[in-house]
Each structure stands twice: as C-alpha cells, then as structure tokens.
C-alpha cells in the first residue's frame, strides 16, 4: 500500500506519538496496518513503546512551516526592490568614504623643517560613516539569507517557482556570494588606521607604513564588484536603475566622479609616500654632526631636544624640496609638494585632488610627466587606461539617457517634417495646411507623443478597466445623462470610452451624414446647428459646452429592439469653436451599453435624456412656437368672426330700409317732382349696402383660408426605448 502524506495532516512530536503499554492506552496508529509499523523491544527497566516510522517525526506542524515561509522575501517584490535601492545608495557612500582614509596623513611644515601627522578629527568623522556603511553591508547579508530564489529547473514557463525553504536558501547563498559579501563588510580600514598603524609607528617610527592602507583597499575591489550585480537586479525588476532619464545621467556622472575621487585620493597618498621616501633616502646619507633618525619625521617628536638640534643642522628637508634644484625626482607628485597640497586643510586638498583626478581621466593622463619610478609609471598607465574606458562609458551612457528624453520630440519633429513634405507634394491649399498643423500641434500638447491606446491594450482587462475608471469616471459623471446610472453601467461605459481631440473649425459631423459615434464634451465648445425645421429658411444654432453631448440619434438607434445595420443620419451639423477634448462612444460600443440600459425600470433616465438632448430642446421650442401661432390664429379668427357678424347685421338693416323706401316710392308715384327727388337719395344708400355685403363675403372667405392653412411643424425626434424587453 502506498502512503501519501497530505498537507492537512498534523504530525505530533515524540512525546505525543509514543504510548505506554503499562497504562494500556490506545496507540495513536493502532488502526494502521502498514507493514513498516514495528514494535521495538526495550530493556525491562524501560517501558515498551511503539516505534513511530521516520516519516512521522516532524517537530514543526505544517501551519507553522507556512508561517516560516511567509517570512521569506520575494526577490521581485517591492520590499526587496526598495532595499536594493537603499543598499545601492549606501554602497556608493561607502565607495566614497573609503578613499578618504588616504587624507588622514599630512605634512606639517614648521619653519625649515617638516613632519608627518595624522588628522584625528577627520579620522573620527570618516570612521563614523564607514562604520555606518558597514552596518548596511551586514544587514544586506541578513536579508539575503531570507530572500527566496527562482529554481532553475522551473524556468521552462513563466517566471518560475520560488524556493522558500530557509535551509536551501542558506545553502545556495553560502556557496555563491557569501564570501564576497563577508569580505566587503569587514571593518578593515578602521582596524588598520586606529590599531595597526599606531602600533607600527610607535615601534618602528616609519611613516612608510601608509602603504599598508593600499593593501587594505584590496577590500575596495569586492565592494566595487557588488555595485554591478546589485544594479543588474534593479534593472531586472524595473528595467532601469533610475526612474527618470536625468537621474540616470546623473548616476553615470556620479560613477565617473567616483573614479576621479579614487584617483585623486590615491595620488595624494602616493605624494605623501614619495615625500617620505625622499626623506628616508636623504636621512640615510647623513651621519655627521648628528645622526638622522626616522623618528624625527614624526610630529610626535617635536618636543624632543635632540630632534630640535637635528633640524637646525640637517639638509634633509632642503634636499627634498621640489622647488629647489635637487637630484631626487618627484615626477607626477611634484605639484602636490610645490603647491603645498599635502599641508593644506582638508577641503582645499580634497578639491584639488578631485580636480587632478577629473582632469587626468578626461585627458587620458596626457598631462602627466612621470619619472623613471616603476610605481609611478604603472600609476600613470592605469590612469590612461581607466580614463579611456570610463570616459567612453560616460559619453555613451549619458548620450543614451539624454537621447531618451528627446526621442519623442525628435520623432514628432520627423513626423511634422514628413507631414509638411506630403502637404507640399499634394499641393494642399493654405487653409487645409493650417488646419493640419493645428491638429498636429494640439495632439502633441495633449499626448506628448504617447500612444495611450497601445499602452492600455497591452494591459490585462481587469487592470485596463480600473485605469479607465480612474481616468474617466469623474469626467463621465459630469455628463448629466450618466449621473443617473449606477456604477456597473458606468464601468461598462468607461471601459469603452475613447479620447477624441478636435481643433478649432473642425467639423465633427455634418447634417445628413451617418452618425458613427456619440460624443461627450469634457473641455471646449461646439456649435450645433440645423436647417431641418419643416419649412424653408429654418435655422437653429446652439452652443455645446462641457457636460453636453451630441450624436443622440445614435442612442435612439441603439435602443431599438431590432436596430438596422444602417446608421442613423445626423439632424445637426456640429463644428468645433475651439480646441475640444471629449470622450467618444462608437456605434458598436454604444449598442452594447444601450443593451445594459434596458435594466433601468425607471422613466427618470428618459426624462433626463429629453431634458439635456438639444434635439429635443429644439423640437420643444418649435412645438411651443407652433402652439403660440395656433393660438394667435384662433384669436384672429374669433375677432374676424365677430367683425363679420356685425357687418352682416348692418347689411340686412340697410336692405330693409332700402326696401321700405322703395315701397313708399311706388305708393307715391303720382307726384312726379317729389318722386324723382326721392329716387336720387335712395341710389347712394343702395350702393353702400352692396359694398358692405361684398366686404363681409371677402372677410368670411379670408377667415376660412386662414383656418385651413397649417404652419409646418418640426418632426418629433425618435423616442429612445428605455423599457425592458419581456
């Protein structure tokens, strides 16, 4: 039977796995029938115990082991990345501090004599910073013992599997980088400067032991080596050491200055060594009148009488003065002695040495005039080689970082030049060229040459959705139509919004053209006009501002249960009055969002759409105007009818009077003169009656015509269907 250990099984310690037979307790594994379960026979004095197989002897429970695994750091995590940056900084600090130990020794000039001394105050300051840097090296070792690594056998696919076993991590680290890190963290300069050198000087009084500091700086090699794998780890995790191009250029310049700092410090120490060598050579030549002792070169012997007597008669210091005509050649170290660099305060001599290193690295050591000394010649050769290599690296890296700053600007310049050449080749008119130039310039100012769509599409869907929500949600909420929607619908909208840029005078859509997108204004102004008012000469124009939208015909089309393939025609002409930034929803995306709108069981969104739709506003204004005109027509018709009724009454009364007068005229026909006089008076009254009758008929005819004529009305916009399909 094959036994498989499950991660959920809790293994107990030996004190719980063993049972005493004398007490007749039930064995823990009594029900186990595996053949490897054996009973061990113990001596009589001891009680019989049940032997537990080796696989069950775990002192740590699985859940405790998971806790230990949680303490292991991920090499690609933020914590390790931040620590690598901090440790890189302190590595650079340590590399700058170590050469400062060379400046502890100096030459003190007292009249005609000189001596060598040590700057204790400077030594304390340098030791403090060096010790502080050493603590970070020790902490780095501790962190590397707790940092997981990727198994080489699991790199077939993806990142690979992290090994989080502390024992395996420690074993791998001890076999690889532990020795280098251990050597780098040892406080060797402090030990040599404060313990070894003072004891040697007190016993032998030989200041040439400063060369021991050069031997100690062998530790500088592993410290310098640690910079490169550390930078490689940061580049592997983030792609670059620094986040900005200027910081990267400064980082490379800092490395070049570090090399100049090391060169200047070594030149200073070798100058001190060269001065001491000359003193010893001249000291060995003197025998009378007083014996020269190398102890006299130490400033600690200034109080001794024999030293004072010796300095009054010796020629050692005059024979080692480079300004005199002497046989000893100082070579490239003569400037440090003639200009009293070795006797100057710390700041002055440090800056001069830094300038010496920077000058000779940049000129590849061409200004160095060496002597025949082997050490001096080798030093000059190293200066020339390192100067050539480091200067080439500096120029290359600086050029790379600085070009990365202007690469997009250069691409934009090339694109603009190609655009100008194309417009000239195609003989475009000047107005079109100006529009193209304005658009290219405005797009550069808005995006700085960054293709946002490509960046977003390269990200995972969930991350892309969160970014779009962060960028667009607050702006989308400014649109009153979207302010009525829930977060889920807004997420769907933000995910499909695309930025749109329009320059002044650009036509977004023309009246009668198919509507391909719905535009939501974020910045700028648009002019929306239409001539479709149902009658000749109709014109309506409005200004769209931030928060408004256009292309609502597309929303009505998308909300149809069975929308056609043909896109709706625009009822308005939309033109940019200034530079406009907006979000656009394409027809397909709007169709998807519109299907989500059907979940809204409220008329509130429909009323909001009507209120903020400029097409509906125009229709409502025309509707009010038509209603007002209809009211005016009715009022006019009523007044005309009233006037007609009065005119008809006057006409009937005039006809009756005329008939009465005519009858009286026939009854009195016997009197000829009187009858003729009466007939002449009746004819004018009868003519007036006929004219009044005709006027009344014309008035009635005009009223009927006005009543029959209807003023054309603007057609009502399509009603968006916000209901839910059953």
UniProtKB/Swiss-Prot annotation:
Protein name per its UniProtKB record: Probable cyclic nucleotide-gated ion channel 14
Keyword set includes Transport: yes
Topology in membrane: Multi-pass membrane protein
Entry's family note: Belongs to the cyclic nucleotide-gated cation channel (TC 1.A.1.5) family.
Extracellular side: 108-122, 199-211, 274-377
Keyword tags: Calmodulin-binding, cAMP, cAMP-binding, Cell membrane, cGMP, cGMP-binding, Ion channel, Ion transport, Ligand-gated ion channel, Membrane, Nucleotide-binding, Transmembrane, Transmembrane helix, Transport
Native organism: Arabidopsis thaliana
Subunit annotation: Homotetramer or heterotetramer.
Chief location category: membrane
Transmembrane residue ranges: 87-107, 123-143, 178-198, 212-232, 253-273, 378-398
Its job: Probable cyclic nucleotide-gated ion channel.
Record-level Gene Ontology MF annotations: calmodulin binding; cAMP binding; cGMP binding; voltage-gated potassium channel activity
Region ranges (Disordered): 707-726
Location within or outside the cell: Cell membrane
One Pfam family matching this protein: Ion_trans
Gene3D superfamilies for this protein: 1.10.287.70, Helix hairpin bin (1.10.287.630), Jelly Rolls (2.60.120.10)
Sequence ranges on the Cytoplasmic membrane side: 1-86, 144-177, 233-252, 399-726
UniProt xrefs under InterPro entries: cNMP-bd_dom, cNMP-bd_dom_sf, Ion_trans_dom, K_chnl_volt-dep_EAG/ELK/ERG, RmlC-like_jellyroll
Disulfide bonds: none
Positions of the IQ domain: 617-646
Region (Calmodulin-binding) location: 597-612
């Amino acid at each position: 039977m094959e036994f498989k250990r499950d991660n959920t099984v809790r293994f107990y310690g030996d004190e719980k796995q063993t049972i005493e037979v004398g007490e007749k307790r039930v064995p823990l594994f009594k029900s186990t029938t595996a053949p490897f379960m054996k009973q061990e026979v113990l001596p009589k004095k001891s009680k019989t115990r049940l032997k537990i197989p080796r696989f069950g002897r775990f002192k740590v429970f699985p859940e405790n082991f998971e806790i230990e695994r949680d303490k292991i750091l991920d090499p690609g995590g933020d914590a390790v990345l931040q620590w690598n940056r901090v440790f890189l900084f302190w590595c650079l600090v340590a590399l700058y501090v170590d050469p400062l130990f060379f400046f502890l020794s100096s030459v003190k000039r007292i009249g005609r004599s000189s001596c060598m001394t040590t700057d204790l105050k400077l030594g304390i300051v340098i030791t403090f910073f060096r010790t502080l840097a050493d603590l970070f090296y020790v902490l780095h070792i501790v962190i590397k013992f707790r940092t997981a690594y990727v198994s080489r056998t699991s790199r077939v696919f993806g990142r690979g599997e992290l090994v989080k076993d502390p024992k395996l991590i420690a074993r791998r680290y001890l076999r690889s980088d532990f020795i280098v890190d251990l050597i780098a963290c040892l406080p060797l300069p402090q030990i040599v400067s404060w313990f070894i050198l003072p004891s040697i000087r007190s016993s032998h009084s030989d200041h040439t032991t400063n060369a021991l500091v050069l031997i100690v700086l062998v530790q500088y090699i592993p410290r310098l080596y640690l910079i490169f794998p550390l930078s490689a780890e940061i580049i592997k995790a983030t792609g670059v050491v620094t986040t900005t191009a200027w910081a990267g250029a400064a980082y490379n310049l800092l490395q070049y200055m570090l090399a100049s700092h090391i060169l200047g410090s070594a030149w200073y120490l070798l100058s001190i060594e060269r001065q001491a060598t000359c003193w010893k050579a001249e000291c060995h030549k003197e025998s009378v009148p007083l014996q020269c002792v190398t102890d006299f070169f130490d400033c600690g012997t200034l109080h001794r009488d024999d030293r004072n007597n010796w300095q009054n008669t010796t020629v050692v210091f005059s024979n080692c003065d480079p300004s005199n005509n002497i046989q000893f050649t100082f070579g490239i170290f003569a400037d440090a002695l003639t200009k009293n660099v070795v006797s100057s305060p710390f700041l002055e001599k440090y800056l001069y040495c830094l300038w010496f290193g920077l000058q000779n690295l940049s000129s590849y050591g061409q200004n160095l005039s060496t002597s025949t000394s082997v050490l001096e010649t080798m030093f000059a050769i190293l200066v020339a080689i390192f100067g050539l290599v480091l200067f080439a690296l500096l120029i290359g890296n600086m050029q790379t970082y600085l070009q990365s700053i202007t690469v997009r600007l250069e691409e934009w310049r090339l694109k603009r030049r190609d655009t100008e050449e194309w417009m000239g080749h195609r003989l475009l008119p000047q107005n079109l060229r100006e529009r193209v130039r304005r658009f290219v310039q405005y797009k550069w100012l808005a995006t700085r040459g960054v293709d946002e769509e490509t960046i977003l599409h390269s990200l995972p869907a969930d991350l892309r959705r969160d970014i779009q929500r962060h960028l667009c949600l607050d702006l989308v909420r400014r649109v009153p139509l979207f302010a009525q929607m829930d977060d889920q619908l807004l997420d769907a909208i933000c995910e499909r919004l695309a930025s749109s840029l329009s320059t002044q005078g650009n036509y977004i859509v023309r009246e009668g053209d198919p509507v391909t997108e719905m535009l939501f204004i974020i910045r700028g102004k648009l002019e929306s006009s239409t001539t479709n008012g149902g009658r000749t000469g109709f014109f309506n124009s409005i200004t769209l501002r931030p928060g408004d939208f256009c292309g609502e015909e597309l929303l009505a089309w998308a909300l149809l249960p069975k929308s056609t393939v043909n896109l709706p025609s625009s009822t308005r002409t939309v033109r940019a009055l200034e530079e406009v930034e907006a979000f656009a929803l394409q027809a397909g995306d709007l169709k998807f969002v519109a299907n989500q709108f059907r979940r809204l069981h409220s008329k509130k969104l429909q009323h909001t759409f009507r209120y903020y739709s400029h097409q509906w506003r125009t229709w409502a204004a025309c509707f009010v105007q038509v209603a007002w005109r209809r009211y005016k027509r009715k009022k006019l018709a009523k007044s005309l009818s009233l006037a007609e009724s009065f005119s008809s009454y006057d006409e009937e009364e005039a006809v009756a009077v005329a008939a009465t007068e005519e009858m009286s005229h026939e009854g009195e026909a016997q009197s000829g003169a009187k009858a003729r006089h009466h007939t002449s008076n009746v004819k004018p009254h009868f003519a007036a009656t006929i004219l009044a009758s005709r006027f009344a008929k014309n008035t009635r005819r005009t009223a009927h015509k006005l009543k029959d004529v209807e003023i054309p009305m603007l057609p009502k916009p399509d009603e968006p269907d916000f209901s839910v399909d059953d």
